[in-house]
């Protein structure tokens, strides 16, 4: 899907994410793993909020996303901040870069948006293909627990000064959650409705680790969200840190 409607409201709905704090966490994570950022890719960068936070910290970073609408927002925001950041439109599973990278980050459950297991494996292989030896791949995912116990078949309502959003979930087999969003925006006393639908899939820690190893990575750690501790049983987000050690898919 293109996220053409969702892109208009993404930053409003994600305003409590805390991108500065998340960028601080990523920087500390890299220090703890004795890794210098070098050339960094923000994979599935969305509207570029985290990309810009890291760029402002001096990280040599560029962003890739499959949504033209998301990238349009990212480019406009970067321009307004006076940041010269390269943004490219590509899918994760068909990643094709101009050169190698030292670091790849992929945050805020972007991996979950790939609902085909083979495509996740392909995305890992493409990151590995362009990753320098000893490069670090850091990503997070919504957990199976979150899909089954939190998202499940529940409905959520989000209200801000700009938009009213109804978020409806339908949990299917293989831990796939179909998400239907209805946005209501007021203009001159009249409410206008727009809708967007997409799906996410929960993957087990074991399956993601297997796919990383098959792509040539060595798993260094799995943390709870914004933490350096072992994840709890009811953790809603996992953070994976893997290092490129055994490139085995250079013909992918």
What are these regions (language model features)?
Residues 1-38:
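Conserved class I S-adenosyl-L-methionine
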Residues 96-103:
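A short acidic, Gly/Pro-enriched loop at the edge of an enzyme's catalytic core
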Residues 118, 138-211:
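SAM-dependent methyltransferase
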């Amino acid at each position: 899907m293109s996220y053409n409607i969702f892109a208009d409201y993404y930053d409003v709905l994600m305003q409590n994410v805390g991108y500065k704090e998340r960028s601080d966490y990523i920087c500390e994570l890299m220090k703890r793993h004795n890794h210098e950022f070098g050339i960094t890719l923000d994979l599935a960068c969305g509207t570029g909020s985290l990309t810009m936070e890291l760029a402002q910290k001096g990280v040599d970073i560029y962003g890739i996303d499959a949504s033209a609408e998301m990238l349009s927002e990212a480019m406009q925001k970067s321009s307004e901040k006076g940041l010269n950041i390269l943004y490219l439109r590509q899918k994760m599973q068909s990643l094709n870069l101009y050169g190698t990278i030292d670091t790849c980050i992929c945050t805020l459950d972007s991996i979950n948006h790939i609902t085909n297991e083979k495509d996740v494996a392909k995305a890992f292989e493409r990151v590995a293909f362009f990753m320098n030896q000893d490069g670090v791949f850091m990503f997070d995912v919504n957990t199976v627990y979150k899909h089954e116990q939190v998202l499940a078949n529940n409905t959520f309502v989000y209200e801000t000064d700009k938009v009213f959003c109804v978020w409806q979930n339908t949990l299917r087999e293989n831990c796939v959650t179909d998400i239907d969003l209805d946005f209501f925006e007021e203009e001159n006393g009249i409410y206008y409705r727009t809708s967007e639908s997409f799906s996410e899939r929960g993957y087990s820690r074991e399956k993601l680790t297997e796919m990383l190893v098959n792509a040539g990575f060595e798993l260094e750690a799995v943390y709870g969200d914004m933490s350096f501790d072992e994840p709890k049983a009811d953790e809603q987000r996992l953070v994976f840190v893997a290092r490129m050690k055994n490139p085995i898919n250079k013909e992918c």
